[in-house]
């Protein structure tokens, strides 16, 4: 079984960068949709595969283009997370996740993972490192127990944090995947 991290396509918050980083719930641009369509040709999704998606509009739109909504589960534990973490950094509004109520309204019928915690307000963006590590390791263990491959559609900082948890060393912002980029761990 493999685990593949996919970064969402080009988002509206990156138009006129950095002036739109405080835009709430930006979606994909036409460029972002085109990037995801190209990525779709590289993926071979199996009926047993599972797609975990950050609760933001741009990641959900990415997932819907890749999967037509099949095997897709929204999971706050793969929501936006700063990298590197710094308590003096202020989170951008573009990284605010949808509430469960907003998800039900905006994307009715999508499955939402019950993580057994109340992280729908703040998400994992500024979560304490130890708490994040405990929750993330729990999610990774859950992934290992599934039958198919796992695809996680998320954000640069989040993906980099998970890559470190999975044993990669010396990662920096230079290692971000870029728009609609992907990184696979074989035999996860």
Residue ranges and their predicted role:
Residues 2, 6-74:
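Active-site-proximal alpha-helix that buttresses catalytic centers in soluble enzyme cores
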Residues 3, 49, 146-156:
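Generic beta-sheet signal
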Residues 9, 156-157:
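Active-site metal-binding loops of divalent metal-dependent hydrolases
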Residues 12-15, 59-62, 81-84, 121, ...:
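Short catalytic/ligand-binding loop motif for oxyanion handling, primarily in non-cytosolic enzymes
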Residues 22-30, 68-135:
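Phosphate-handling substructures
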Residues 46-77, 101-115, 167, 186-188:
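Conserved histidine-centered catalytic loops in small-molecule metabolism enzymes
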Residues 131-146:
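A short, acidic, amphipathic alpha-helical segment used as a generic capping/interface helix at domain edges
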Residues 167-188:
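Domain-level recognition of soluble alpha/beta enzyme cores
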């Amino acid at each position: 079984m493999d685990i593949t991290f996919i970064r969402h396509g080009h988002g509206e918050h990156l138009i006129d960068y950095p002036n739109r980083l405080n835009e709430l719930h930006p979606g994909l641009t036409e460029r972002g949709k085109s990037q995801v369509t190209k990525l779709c040709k590289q993926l071979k999704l199996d009926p047993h595969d599972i797609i975990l998606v950050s609760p933001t509009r741009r990641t959900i739109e990415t997932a819907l283009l890749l999967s037509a909504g099949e095997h897709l589960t929204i999971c706050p534990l793969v929501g936006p997370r700063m990298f590197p973490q710094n308590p003096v950094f202020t989170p951008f509004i573009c990284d605010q996740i949808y509430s469960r109520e907003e998800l039900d309204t905006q994307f009715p019928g999508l499955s939402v993972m019950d993580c057994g915690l109340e992280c729908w307000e703040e998400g994992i963006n500024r979560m304490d490192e130890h708490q994040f590590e405990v929750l993330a390791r729990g999610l990774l263990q859950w992934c290992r127990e599934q039958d198919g491959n796992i695809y996680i559609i998320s954000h640069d900082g989040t993906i980099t944090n998970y890559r470190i948890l999975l044993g990669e060393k010396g990662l920096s912002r230079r290692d971000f995947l870029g728009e609609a980029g992907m990184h696979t761990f074989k035999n996860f």
